[in-house]
Design a protein with these regions (language model features):
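Transmembrane signal-anchor hairpin modules in multi-pass inner-membrane enzymes, especially those
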Residues: 1-79, 86, 100, 106-122, ...
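Alpha-helical transmembrane segments of multi-pass inner-membrane proteins
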Residues: 19, 23-24, 100-103, 108, ...
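Hydrophobic alpha-helical membrane-interfacial segments at the cytosolic entry of transmembrane helices
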Residues: 65-72, 119-130, 185-190, 224-245
Length: 420
């Protein structure tokens, strides 16, 4: 196997490493920090590509598939908004972040050295710790933990994801030193604390998914039954421990209370409002399946739907902000094009990670497992909230899957025994 192609100078290598180290923490600590990190990383990636870091190698099938998936959002929005005669630039903001992931992947697959990818060992736990620090500094512990620019749902989602990326990153590229292992464990604990304080129930649903991914990647055929039993036991233990934590107990109890009130005709609860908005979205999708209602169409439909009694005034007010489901949001706004886009950005990267998850090269296999956690994690988060309506979360998702896919498939890159 040929050694990886190094960046054209040491400055580029250092900048790449610094960006990868800092971007998860900047998501929580600096308004605009995540977007700024991605823009700089994308610009540097383009410079590396123009400098010939790929040495004119042809694109591989996986790279082409990734590029098509990441560009599908811009194409979908363009087609639908042309149909609706509304091409306001703001509609393309989040989708543009996905496109920026393409040069990042292409450059890092060939220009990423061991030093560059080694930064990820620290990035994810530091990001989780930064989330806890941001909540503590801003003293927003009253009801739901949040920051001045990240609401409690997105905060909890990102924190729980970084917690498990920290945990699964233990002994990523070899046997970790004790300080590095303690850092990763601290990141895991910090992420869990923020998730509990945020009381974001959608993030908790992803925990069994993360565990299942890890077990699948380490599954050996002759131990199938033992693995299934261990998974069931792990879920049971986590469930029992979680039930003893008051905020979790309270939020889980509210699910049954909300559903009971909804059946009794009291629709303006947390779950009741979501059910109303999902019903409204499905109604509009049935009426406009091909081109959707346009980027602003769902918000505009809220008042008329409230006036005819399909949804309550409170649901209409909240629906002007979001649909509370990423898949329904993209489908109701952009029709089958939006549905294709959101499925592509979830499951094409997931498939590419899945192919690498049982690689004989541990660093690449662990990178792939973590990538599977990111893609399926965002899929689960997006069942109950829009995840890509915020540009910073769209940037975080697209940057992270690009970086992890580069680490999982990097040309000739089989780093070993970092962290010693």
């Amino acid at each position: 196997m040929k050694p990886p192609i190094k960046p054209y100078n040491i400055a580029a290598e250092n900048i790449l490493g610094a960006l990868l180290l800092a971007y998860p923490a900047l998501l929580f600590l600096v308004r605009g920090g995540m977007n700024g990190s991605m823009f700089v990383l994308a610009i540097l990636s383009v410079m590396l590509l123009l400098a010939g870091c790929r040495k004119h190698l042809p694109l591989q099938a996986g790279e082409i598939a990734f590029a098509l998936a990441m560009s599908s959002g811009l194409v979908a929005i363009l087609i639908v908004q042309i149909y609706h005669h509304d091409l306001a630039a703001r509609y393309f903001d989040s989708a543009a972040r996905f496109l920026l992931a393409v040069p990042i992947l292409l450059a890092l697959r060939h220009a990423g050295t061991e030093k560059v990818f080694h930064a990820l060992q620290y990035a994810f736990p530091l990001g989780a710790i930064a989330a806890l620090l941001a909540v503590w500094v801003e003293n927003r512990w009253h009801a739901y933990a949040q920051t001045s620019f990240l609401n409690h749902i997105h905060l909890g989602d990102m924190a729980i994801l970084l917690a498990f990326l920290s945990l699964f990153g233990i002994n990523w590229t070899g046997r970790d030193s004790l300080p590095l292992k303690l850092l990763k464990i601290s990141g895991f604990v910090a992420g869990l604390i923020v998730s509990v304080l945020s009381q974001a129930r959608g993030s908790w649903i992803a925990i069994p998914i993360f565990i299942a991914i890890y077990i699948y990647a380490h599954l050996q055929t002759k131990y199938v039954m033992r693995t299934v039993l261990l998974f069931a036991l792990a879920v049971l233990v986590i469930g029992l421990v979680s039930w003893s934590i008051e905020p979790i107990q309270l939020r889980i109890g509210m699910i049954f209370s909300d559903l009971s009130q909804f059946r009794a005709g009291h629709a303006d609860t947390s779950i009741g409002i979501r059910l109303q908005l999902w019903g409204a979205a499905l109604h509009l999708i049935a009426e406009n399946p091909f081109f959707g209602v346009g980027a602003g169409g769902f918000a505009e439909a809220m008042q008329p739907m409230s006036e005819v009694g399909r949804i309550t005034p409170l649901a209409a007010e909240l629906g002007r902000g979001e649909v509370h489901s990423e898949i329904l949001a993209q489908t109701v706004r952009f029709g089958i094009f939006g549905l294709g886009f959101v499925m592509a950005v979830y499951f094409i990267p997931f498939y590419l990670f899945l192919r690498q998850a049982k690689s004989v090269h541990r660093p690449q296999a662990i990178s792939a497992i973590m990538g599977m956690c990111v893609t399926l994690g965002f899929f689960v988060f997006g069942l109950t909230v829009e995840t890509f309506d915020l540009k910073m979360t769209a940037a975080f998702y697209s940057t992270t899957i690009a970086v992890l896919l580069a680490a999982a498939t990097a040309a000739g890159n089989h780093p070993n025994r970092h962290g010693k």
